[in-house]
Regions:
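N-terminal "cap/leader" segments of large eukaryotic alpha-helical scaffolds
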Residues: 1-19
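Ankyrin repeat domain, specifically the short helix-to-loop turn at the C-terminus of the second helix
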Residues: 21-26, 51-60, 81-90, 123-132, ...
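Ankyrin-repeat intra-repeat helix-capping/turn positions
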Residues: 12, 45, 75, 109, ...
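Solenoidal tandem-repeat scaffolds enriched in leucines and small polar residues
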Residues: 78-79, 83-157, 161-163
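Internal amphipathic alpha-helical repeat/solenoid segments
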Residues: 13-63
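Membrane-proximal ectodomain caps of single-pass cell-surface receptors
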Residues: 131-134, 138-144, 149-204
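Start-of-repeat signature of ankyrin repeats
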Residues: 1, 34, 64, 98, ...
């Protein structure tokens, strides 16, 4: 990547971005990017710059990890929310091993300092793209499978309540690559305060 463009993306300076575009009008089209300015800006949480690049060059959103993955990885929740508001399809972009942003949040630790943000992000993702609950990784795992494997009680509890409210219990019947249904994984998990009877009632 052009070093001036990289530096501008890291700093999140939109004025400098347009100065570079003015001096090199085809810079966003000409370069073969491995790491795009969008990703460079999203990683440190330079939200406005990331959104401006996304507007100028929409194709960047599909390169490697999405900017949403990078913002999540670095816990820039405000950047995540604004990127989702700009383009809800980012929620279904798959990164390494087929992990979507929903899977990524389901996988993160249940740190008390981050628990409320996790629930807020899960709610936001599912509000704007409810079909993302059906997305699976290359291992055929749903967000629920991942929550169980990661011992993420807050995620699992939220998703089960969401399934109950939205009548999408069929996701509990989806199996991973080992043939284990989401429902079976949940019933065998160590979260003793989950009520098995209420979980069974979700299955259509």
């Amino acid at each position: 990547m052009d070093p001036d463009l990289r530096g501008t993306a890291r700093a999140g300076n939109i004025n400098d971005l347009y100065a570079i575009i003015q001096s090199k009008p085809d810079i966003l089209d000409k370069e073969l990017f491995v790491e795009t300015p969008l990703h460079v800006a999203a990683s440190p949480g330079e939200t406005n710059f990331a959104l401006e690049i996304l507007r100028l060059k929409p194709s960047f959103r599909r390169k490697r990890l999405s900017p949403l993955h990078l913002a999540l990885q670095n816990k820039h929740s405000d950047t995540v929310r604004r990127l989702v508001k700009f383009d809800s399809k980012l929620i279904r972009v798959k990164g390494r091993e087929g992990l979507t942003p929903l899977h990524f949040v389901a996988k993160t630790d249940d740190q008390l300092s981050f628990a409320d943000q996790k629930v807020d992000l899960l709610s936001k993702f599912l509000d704007v793209c409810s079909s993302s609950i059906n997305d699976v990784t290359i291992h055929e795992e749903t967000a629920l499978h991942i929550a169980v494997k990661s011992s993420s009680f807050y995620t699992l509890q939220f998703l089960l309540i969401w399934l109950q409210k939205t009548y999408k219990g069929e996701v509990l019947c989806l199996t991973d690559e080992g043939g284990k249904a989401t429902l079976c994984c949940i019933l065998r998990c160590p979260f003793h305060n989950l009520r098995h009877a209420s979980i069974y009632s979700l299955v259509p």
